[in-house]
């Protein structure tokens, strides 16, 4: 009921919600993210503010502090107004580079598939070369093509620091950007 999984599931069931991230700070001090001591955080993409606030209210203990830039008033069954807080995600540009050997006529499809994979990652998710290549393979763009090597690397937009994996911050949703 009040656990993070229950809250997460309730948020994903809200009409229009496409992604969510739920976490907490169990410590007695403000943490490195700026979260209040003994508090919860909810980052929700999509859905109406009021519907999200009501879902959070139904699944949480109101004595636990919340972090957020969105504040919504929910009225409880006694007529008392309660403030529910949550965040909306920020878009994180994710630059990516693709190396295909030998060069392939499928490169446009491969790039589009990798961009779709990146864009499908949840708020605060992990983007990996392995999963990007699997998306390309599953789409049928590797079989029978003669491709012997496919490498995909990712970087936070504009940083130029490319790696085979990229962990997004808790409040970021990705948007893929091919860099050539």
Regions found by a protein language model. Give the residues of each.
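An aromatic-glycine-centered, glycine-rich loop/turn in mixed alpha/beta architecture
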Residues: 87, 105-180
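Carbohydrate-recognition loop of C-type lectin domains
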Residues: 1-128
């Amino acid at each position: 009921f009040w656990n993070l999984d229950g809250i997460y599931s309730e948020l994903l069931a809200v009409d229009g919600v496409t992604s969510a991230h739920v976490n907490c700070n169990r410590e007695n001090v403000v943490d490195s993210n700026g979260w209040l001591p003994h508090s919860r955080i909810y980052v929700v993409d999509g859905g109406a503010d009021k519907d999200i606030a009501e879902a959070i209210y139904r699944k949480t203990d109101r004595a636990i502090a919340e972090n957020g830039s969105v504040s919504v008033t929910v009225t409880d069954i006694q007529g008392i107004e309660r403030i529910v807080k949550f965040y909306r995600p920020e878009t994180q540009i994710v630059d990516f580079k693709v190396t295909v050997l030998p060069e392939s006529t499928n490169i446009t499809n491969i790039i589009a598939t990798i961009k779709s994979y990146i864009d499908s990652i949840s708020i605060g998710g992990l983007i990996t070369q392995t999963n990007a290549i699997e998306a390309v393979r599953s789409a049928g763009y590797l079989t029978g093509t003669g491709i012997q090597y496919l490498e995909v690397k990712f970087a936070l937009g504009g940083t130029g620091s490319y790696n085979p994996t990229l962990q997004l911050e808790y409040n970021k949703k990705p948007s893929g950007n091919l860099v050539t």
